[in-house]
Amino acid sequence: SYPYEILTYLFDSYYVLPQRPDLAALFCWQAINHSYYVQQLGDNSIGFCVDTKGVELVREALLAEWNNRYKAILEPFLLKLPMKTFHYVASYLLKGYAMESAGIAEKYRASSYKSLKGKIPVLSDILINSYGNVYNQIANPVVVGNKVDLGIDNLNKEKSRAITHSFATKLRKLVKGDEVEITFSDIARTKKRYSFTEEERLSFVLFGILYASRCNNFHGNVAA
């Protein structure tokens, strides 16, 4: 009863997952892409097929049967997502925030930066009050030609990696369903606890990882 094309994409995804999580994400995206286009084509109320709406339809379908059907299947994969994946998301969120803070045109930022912040508001709070603010202290992004130079000097490159890794570690815990404590960068060193809802966990994976990875693979090293 399962569409042949979707199954082949998923089998390909499982096969390459241990060695090439980037390709696994791409094959997984193709399965999702195929499923939501079939769904949109069968809905007469939808006049034009678009990726964002399609992914939202997939997310809504998963959430509708999350506890009864899908959680037991998908939860193990959420718990085993590799750290490299979270470094990828943390990196484009921090770079996007630095560019936005510096007034760099939106076209230079990854589109997933804006969409993920919009779908998971706590990420904006964490960036503004903690990781993004700290990252801005070492970054001075400027447009050079048709690219953005983040302006991080050699003395601060290790600090940049440390900030990205720490942020990625927090993101991984949030996706696992844990509550995390974030220390703000204010003088009082305010601490606040955050957690993701089930909808935010799925939004992070579908939009922040799979869709963002798809854009990166198709468009290369450009804002997409």
Model-found features: residue ranges?
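Helix-loop junctions and short alpha-helical segments
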Residues: C28, S35-I182
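Phosphate-binding glycine-rich loops and adjacent basic patches that engage nucleotide phosphates
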Residues: P18, L171-G177, E199-F207
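Accessory, usually C-terminal, subdomains that scaffold auxiliary metal cofactors
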Residues: D186-A224
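Short amphipathic alpha-helical segments and their helix-coil junctions
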Residues: Y2-P18, G145-N146, G151, D186-R193
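Residue-level detector of well-ordered alpha-helical segments, enriched
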Residues: L23-C28, I73, L206, S213
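Charged alpha-helical initiation segments
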Residues: S1-Q30, S35, L41-S45
